[in-house]
């Protein structure tokens, strides 16, 4: 039996929600290990849709233990609001079913404000990153700068007050420089103390809980957010998120050693999408992109922003397979390609007259890439709802097999519609 890490292999929005939902039913423990409430996904259970941003997917299933690891940045007010929203849908999230790592860094209102100040200023100069304005980046900055307020500090008012002083020394200097009013010590203390009693019952030593679960033979699912190409180191920097999104972060962001990670499953869309700014070599800013966006309902769960759409980029996904150590992929949204006469796949790039087989790290080089395409025959029959290989058109099977060859990883799960039952299981990631 293997523990499973789920990661996105593109720029996020690959359809992790459905796959994580399917896996979480089989897991005993579900862990969030990076990101914040900036990346959402929708779970559909018994016809009811649940939209989650911060909470692990295990919370909507009874009998599962859900954990928020130290690699997450934690907005306490968003946490309380999400729990209340689920309560309105009949889901009870309690300290028995959910634990938050005591050493998790907090997102405060001043982080959200700084995020917005910077994006507004960058918009005026044409240099914006396209963040969700939820304070994720500034919160990670404070964590790395060793001035973050962490969940455990809510239990110690004296230490909390000193840490707020230190935090405000930094932030008020920034706010003055950006031409904005300072924040008072009293305002931040009130913001934190007003919610402390609702947060502290959930706080625990997540690393110890995970080690006990591992020793007991529990099945652990590590739930990643965003995608590999948004990784702070391995993504299309600077148009990335502020955390490591690759599979290696599952260990760092939870406190369980890397040897406990078994199967790495890369969620991979059958075409490519991206939200916000940044390079996108296979983008189709034309009727093909419109078709993919409309057929695939490509709008963000959290922001509602329209996603940019393009052809499958085998070069980029192959690189993700390597940087994550993927054991296999879950290929999603194959049905969106139904009815297309021909389908293109990027198999290389042309950069300044030379052919390359990797995504360069340089921002300038990324902007100058010309994709090299291979054109495949499409299929007229539908793949939607297929649950076994024999249900698929021959050309769709060829497309899937060719992707496996190009990226160097097998398809473990093939998703053929948003419905959780509509999938072809080739390999159960939890089985050794």
From Swiss-Prot:
Its EC number is 6.3.4.4. IMP binds at residues 13-16, 38-41, 132, 146, 226, 241, 305. Substrate binds at residues 301-307. It is an enzyme of class 6 (ligase). GO terms for cellular component: cytoplasm. Pathway: Purine metabolism; AMP biosynthesis via de novo pathway; AMP from IMP: step 1/2. Its main location: cytoplasm. Binds 1 Mg(2+) ion per subunit. One of its GO terms (molecular function) is GTP binding. Mg(2+) binds at residues 13, 40. CDD domains: AdSS (cd03108). It is found in: Cytoplasm. Its cofactor is Mg(2+). Keywords: Cytoplasm, GTP-binding, Ligase, Magnesium, Metal-binding, Nucleotide-binding, Purine biosynthesis. It catalyses: IMP + L-aspartate + GTP = N(6)-(1,2-dicarboxyethyl)-AMP + GDP + phosphate + 2 H(+). Homodimer. Plays an important role in the de novo pathway of purine nucleotide biosynthesis. Catalyzes the first committed step in the biosynthesis of AMP from IMP. Belongs to the adenylosuccinate synthetase family. This is Adenylosuccinate synthetase. The gene is purA.
């Amino acid at each position: 039996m293997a523990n499973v890490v789920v990661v996105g292999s593109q720029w996020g929005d690959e359809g992790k929600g459905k796959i994580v939902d399917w896996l979480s039913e089989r897991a005993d423990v579900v862990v969030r290990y990076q990101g914040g409430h900036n990346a959402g996904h929708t779970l559909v259970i018994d016809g009811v849709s649940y939209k989650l941003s911060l909470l692990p997917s295990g919370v909507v299933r009874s009998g599962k233990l859900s954990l928020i690891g130290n690699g997450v940045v934690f907005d306490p007010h968003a946490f309380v609001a999400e729990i209340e929203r689920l309560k309105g849908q009949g889901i009870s999230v309690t300290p028995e079913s959910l634990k938050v790592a005591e050493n998790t860094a907090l997102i405060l209102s001043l982080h959200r404000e700084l995020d917005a100040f910077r994006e507004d200023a960058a918009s005026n100069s044409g240099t914006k990153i396209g963040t969700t304005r939820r304070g994720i980046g500034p919160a990670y900055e404070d964590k790395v700068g060793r001035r973050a307020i962490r969940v455990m500090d809510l239990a110690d008012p004296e230490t909390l007050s000193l840490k707020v002083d230190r935090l405000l020394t930094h932030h008020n200097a920034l706010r003055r420089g950006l031409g904005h009013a300072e924040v008072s010590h009293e305002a931040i203390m009130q913001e934190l103390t007003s919610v402390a009693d609702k947060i502290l019952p959930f706080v625990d030593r997540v690393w110890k809980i995970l080690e006990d679960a591992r020793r007991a033979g529990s099945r652990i699912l590590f739930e990643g957010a965003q995608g590999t190409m948004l990784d702070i180191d391995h993504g299309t920097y600077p148009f990335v998120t502020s955390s490591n999104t690759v599979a290696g972060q599952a260990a760092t962001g939870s406190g369980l050693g890397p040897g406990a990670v078994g199967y790495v499953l890369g969620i991979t869309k059958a075409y490519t999408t991206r939200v916000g700014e940044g390079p996108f070599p296979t983008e189709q800013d034309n009727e093909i992109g419109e078709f993919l966006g409309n057929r695939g309902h490509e709008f963000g769960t959290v922001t509602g922003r329209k996603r940019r759409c393009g052809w499958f980029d085998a070069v980029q996904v192959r690189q993700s397979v390597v940087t994550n150590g993927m054991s296999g992929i879950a290929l999603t949204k194959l049905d969106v390609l139904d009815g297309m006469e021909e389908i293109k796949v990027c198999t290389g790039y042309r950069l300044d007259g030379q052919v390359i087989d990797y995504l360069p790290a340089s921002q300038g080089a990324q902007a100058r890439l010309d994709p090299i395409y291979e054109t495949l025959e499409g299929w007229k029959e539908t793949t939607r709802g297929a649950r076994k290989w024999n249900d698929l058109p021959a050309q769709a099977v060829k497309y899937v097999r060719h992707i496996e060859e190009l990226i160097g990883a097998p398809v473990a799960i093939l998703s053929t519609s948003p419905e959780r039952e509509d999938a072809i299981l080739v390999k159960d990631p939890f089985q050794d």
